[in-house]
Regions:
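Conserved ABC transporter NBD signature motif
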Residues: 1-6, 15, 289-297
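Conserved ABC ATPase "signature" region
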Residues: 51-69, 342-360
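Conserved ABC ATPase signature
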Residues: 73-77, 81, 364-368
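Catalytic Walker B motif of ABC-type/P-loop ATPase nucleotide-binding domains
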Residues: 98-101, 389-392
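Conserved beta-strand-loop-alpha-helix hinge in the C-terminal portion
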Residues: 155-181, 445-467
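The feature captures the beta-strand-to-loop junction immediately N-terminal to the Walker
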Residues: 266-268
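Helix-to-loop junction immediately C-terminal to a conserved catalytic motif
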Residues: 281
């Protein structure tokens, strides 16, 4: 039952009045031409008066930090901003229950924390039941969670308090990533069953002996070694860019990516990460400045020309796929470049073997999992033999098993094939575990450029860039 009503007796329209839903992909929820129109849409359908519309839109825009965005097109916003607009559009109609599918997937750590605090406020002050579906368990646990339900193989594998779930190692057993601090406690030799308030990092209650164990473990961790940087492969020199009728996002911006690096590009939502990638790949053109690939100026190269050197994989593979069959999708780029069929077949098969997709070469893409589709889009980029691969949120929305498979594949690609990898991510765990360099972007400039450990021990950078 839902709110005491048998679900079998409720159609989709009825359900929409009982449960407000925020989808993982906010673009699929937008109906208004501006943020204000989109947030107000439900109230317009309810035939609310204009003054009520204005008051409630202003109220939720203030709560979700959307005031400066009300006149913008939803499609022009960053992923995190889109998420907040979708949330406001649901909350404004006073639904009796709220369901969120991967609400943290597109948010930087600080925005995610703010989102969780808002949900906590809705539960505690508005008495609104909230159901959260998410893989980013550590961030979800930033607020009090009453109950955690783990599903596996079509059944309920666990239904308990978060603290008991963590103490019983249920997450790892069911392919979910446990909070990093729990992993650290285990590595230090601490019996997590004896730790009080294990589900609350801020209130974690360690005994004196447990604190000593943890301190000793941290002190004995191996220190990362400085490595000599290779030659530049991508160099941005004096890059300036602004969207029409807006202030400059980049003003005489400089950045160098070195050959063979596995780098992470991080920063708060809306700080220019996606814009920067679009400038590198050619989807946007700078007002001034130069883009070098090695020693070659590629500033005037087309998107197609740059794709031969720089592969780009979007966060959502469904936005990139244009063919029905796996082979056809991976072969498309070669066919558009006039490569003969025999060469195309060989290069596609070689690429499918590298990406672990060769057994599925004759499969329809619709039969694949999200993670496998992601690999197809990577294969479609790799078949052109680019020297650089740029990925937007490579592991977003994936469980631990698919997360590990994807990252192991990228590491092998980097180490064995020599491919330079640039990952745009909000996942600090991913950055710490896999990147050898972190570039922190803030308001169109490089705030920090250092090893991941150095970035995450700089409190000023963490606060300014919303990394924690």
């Amino acid at each position: 039952t839902i709110n005491g009503k048998p679900q079998s007796e409720l159609d989709l329209t009825d359900l929409s009045f009982e449960v407000g839903t925020v989808l993982q992909d906010p673009d699929s929820q937008f109906v208004g031409l501006t943020v204000a129109e989109d947030v107000a849409f439900a109230l317009e359908n309810d035939a609310q008066k204009v003054d009520v519309l204005h008051r409630k839109v202003a109220e939720w825009a203030d709560r979700l930090n959307l005031k400066a965005l009300l006149n913008k097109h939803p499609q022009d916003l960053s992923g995190g901003q889109k998420q907040r607009v979708a949330l406001a559009g649901v909350l404004i109609d006073n639904e009796p229950m709220l369901l969120l599918d991967e609400p943290l997937a597109n948010l930087d750590p600080a925005a995610g924390r703010a989102s969780m605090k808002l949900l906590d406020w809705l539960v505690s002050q508005q008495d609104l039941p909230v159901i959260i579906i998410d893989h980013r368990i550590e961030e979800v646990l930033q607020i009090p969670i009453d109950r955690m339900v783990i599903r596996a193989d079509g059944r309920v594998a666990a239904d308990d308090t978060p603290e008991q779930i963590l103490k019983q190692n249920i997450l790892l057993k069911n392919g979910l990533r446990e909070p990093l601090y729990v992993t650290a406690l285990k590595a230090a030799g601490i019996d997590i069953r004896a730790v009080e308030r294990l589900d609350d990092l801020a209130g974690l209650n360690l005994t004196t002996d447990q604190q000593a164990q943890l301190t000793s473990w941290v002190a004995n961790l191996p220190q990362p070694k400085e490595t000599k940087k290779a030659d530049p492969i991508i160099s941005l020199r004096g890059l300036t860019f602004a969207y029409p009728d807006e202030e400059k996002i980049f003003d005489k911006f400089d950045l160098t990516i070195h050959r063979g690096e596995m780098a992470a590009l991080v920063g708060r939502n809306g700080t220019g990460k996606t814009t920067l990638i679009n400038l590198i790949t050619g989807f946007l053109k700078p007002t001034s400045g130069r883009l070098l690939f090695g020693d070659t100026d590629i500033s005037t190269d087309s998107v197609k020309q740059r794709a031969d050197r720089i592969g780009y994989v979007l966060q959502d593979p469904n936005q990139m796929i244009s063919k029905t069959m796996i082979f056809d999708e991976v072969a498309l780029g070669l066919e558009l470049r006039g490569v003969d069929s025999e060469t195309t077949k060989k290069r596609v098969f070689d690429t499918l073997k590298i990406t672990g997709l060769y057994p599925y070469r004759n499969w329809p893409i619709s039969a694949l999992s999200f993670g496998q589709k992601k690999r197809v889009t990577i294969a479609a980029a790799l078949v052109l033999r680019p020297e650089v691969l740029i990925l937007d949120e490579p592991t977003a929305g994936q469980d631990l098993a698919h997360y590990a498979q994807m990252m192991d594949f990228l590491v092998a690609l980097n180490r064995q094939q020599g491919t330079t990898v640039l990952m745009v991510t909000h996942d600090m765990n991913l950055m710490m575990a896999y990147a050898d360099r972190t570039i922190v972007l803030d308001q169109g400039r490089v705030l920090e450029d250092a090893a991941p450990a150095k970035v995450l021990t700089n409190q000023a950078v963490i606060a300014k860039a919303h990394l924690g």
